[in-house]
Amino acid sequence: MVSEITHKSYPLHFVLFPFMAQGHMIPMVDIARLLAQRGVKITIVTTPHNAARFKNVLSRAIESGLPISIVQVKLPSQEAGLPEGNETLDSLVSMELMIHFLKAVNMLEEPVQKLFEEMSPQPSCIISDFCLPYTSKIAKKFNIPKILFHGMCCFCLLCMHILRKNREIVENLKSDKEHFVVPYFPDRVEFTRPQVPVATYVPGDWHEITEDMVEADKTSYGVIVNTYQELEPAYANDYKEARSGKAWTIGPVSLCNKVGADKAERGNKADIDQDECLKWLNSKEEGSVLYVCLGSICNLPLSQLKELGLGLEESQRPFIWVIRGWEKNKELHEWFSESGFEERIKDRGLLIKGWAPQMLILSHHSVGGFLTHCGWNSTLEGLTAGLPLLTWPLFADQFCNEKLAVQVLKAGVSAGVDQPMKWGEEEKIGVLVDKEGVKKAVEELMGESDDAKEIRRRAKELGELAHKAVEEGGSSHSNITSLLEDIMQLAQSNN
């Protein structure tokens, strides 16, 4: 095991580059704390606004003696054609700004290079989000190994790896509705073309950016994955083999949040009083509450959100519904009051407008299920809490995560969404699951059928395995040790 003594004789210094989006930043901050707990000096490079989001959690970590520091770099917004103040993905008012955002982020190469010239001690390793391909140039210039972090599971990473090597499979499909089987996969899993996060061709600037990301992926020294061996063993083994052994599963990283305040403020300060939330949860029966959260970048149209709300109401089960605080939802809040929805569900439903203390809620004994958009952080947090999932994927890797949870792990029920909610086409796509479909899916998950009971048993089992994985001697704990030993050997051979 890498010991404190070894660190003191040859201190390791990891520089972390999180991508500026909540779903990417949250696990990277957890990774920083996990590594710092092993005596590694950590430097996090981010922008002022993003640093402010994690100020409380990181301040507590630093005050407890963890060797973590934050270096802030200004995002060159204007130079990239981005309005000032747009420092996070979830702050973009339209996805048209996404290309400008990615350009701005990757223009940080020059100021970061200057930082590295002055950094002490010299960095031993870079851990970078895959959305930041410029960090490969920094790693090459300073001869530092770069570890990639995708924020996805091994199931999805292996799927992407196979489909990139066999592009003709997706390219030869006759339509977006045609299904195909992923070859060389441990299980038989079918997708349609829009459901997989592998673009066969993207035009203009997008093509250049995605190619840069793929190239940076290929040339990275290795990969860390926020998952645990026992959750997806066949996929973890095959992906590790595809990466020539340099893939380490170190999750669930969220379990480093043991203090109540860290759980409550993970990612951002909650928009509901913690005591008020706990009081409401304490008033409900064990396992009776459905927690509903479709992520920080939910783009469902108003018509679909109404059907979701009415379906939750008709399910006659207590629920917490987290609604992202963005401009489009103003109409939804008007509907809540004008239609009488908020009044009708006030005794049974809790509406949280904005950011919720998700980890705190998921770990409460009264919560018995999680309706999720299947972002990997949420999927893993739900399973780690031992909760069965009601899956409602929107885009990106979320259909992969649904297939893993429902088909492979058998720890969830699909709401029945079969196509992505494309940005800019939400109104055209409209309602994919009506209120009857929502009510039926909730019953399948939370009801008393044999299937529902088996799904709940399976989810609970996976939750117990998650906690064992991060304990000393567990698979993820051992993999962090293995990663540090690998980087230690490299650092010593380079000097």
Swiss-Prot record:
Top EC group: transferase
GO molecular-function terms, A-Z: UDP-glucosyltransferase activity
Protein residues bound to an anthocyanidin: H24, A396
GO biological process: saponin metabolic process
UniProt keywords, alphabetically: Glycosyltransferase, Transferase
Domain of life of the source: Eukaryota
PROSITE patterns: UDPGT
Highest classification ranks of the organism: Eukaryota, Viridiplantae, Streptophyta, Embryophyta, Tracheophyta
InterPro entries for the chain: UDP_glucos_trans, UDP_glycos_trans_CS
EC number per UniProt: 2.4.1.368
Family: Belongs to the UDP-glycosyltransferase family.
Residue numbers binding UDP-alpha-D-glucose: A356, Q358, H373, W376, N377, S378, E381, D397, Q398
Active site: H24, D129
Name the UniProt record assigns to this protein: UDP-glycosyltransferase 73C12
UniProt catalytic activity: oleanolate + UDP-alpha-D-glucose = oleanolate 3-O-beta-D-glucoside + UDP + H(+)
Role played: The monoglucosylated hederagenin 3-O-beta-D-glucoside is a feeding deterrent of the yellow-striped flea beetle (Phyllotreta nemorum).
Disulfide bonds: none
